[in-house]
């Protein structure tokens, strides 16, 4: 009798585990929405210029935060550019490093800009931030590359990405 009960309980457990394994697990939904350049303009009223030789260009938005993003590859490196409405200067990059070698007295278009670099010997992260005061838009462009990026000019790529809202800068 004990053997029969053990067999029945084992069979019930197997059925339960099988049912659980076949039930899809609901996770947190991805808040990022893949879109197009036109979709960003329609939904958020912002646009990126795509650098001429860029490949694998992907647009997405975090609509609840009015955050637009463009990922692309250029000359063997991966980049992430972002735009978000803002009333003041803020870091929207999502890159959390101890920035060294910062540069502050320059512009992207006619916008005040900041650039920083962080390196750990194996990889180097570069970030450029700029703020277009008139429309109230904060911009960021970042990349992480292997090794030393000496001589690399992220600001030149930022100029290619920036689409002035007020016309030519």
Predicted regions and their residues:
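Sec-dependent N-terminal signal peptides of Gram-positive bacterial secreted proteins and lipoproteins
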Residues: 1-22
């Amino acid at each position: 009798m004990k053997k029969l009960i053990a067999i029945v309980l084992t069979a019930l457990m197997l059925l339960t585990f099988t049912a659980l394994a076949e039930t899809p697990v609901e996770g947190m939904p991805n808040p990022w929405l893949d879109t197009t350049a036109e979709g960003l303009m329609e939904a958020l009223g912002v646009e990126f210029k795509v650098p001429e030789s860029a490949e694998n260009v992907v647009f997405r938005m975090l609509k609840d935060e009015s955050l637009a993003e463009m990922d692309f590859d250029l000359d063997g490196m991966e980049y992430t550019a972002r735009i978000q409405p803002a009333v003041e200067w803020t870091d929207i990059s999502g890159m959390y490093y101890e920035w060294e070698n910062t540069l502050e007295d320059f512009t992207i278009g006619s916008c005040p800009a900041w650039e920083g670099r962080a390196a750990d010997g194996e990889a180097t992260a570069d970030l450029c931030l700029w703020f277009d005061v008139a429309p109230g838009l904060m911009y960021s462009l970042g990349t992480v590359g292997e090794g030393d990026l000496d001589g690399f000019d992220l600001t030149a790529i930022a100029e290619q990405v920036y689409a002035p809202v007020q016309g030519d800068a």
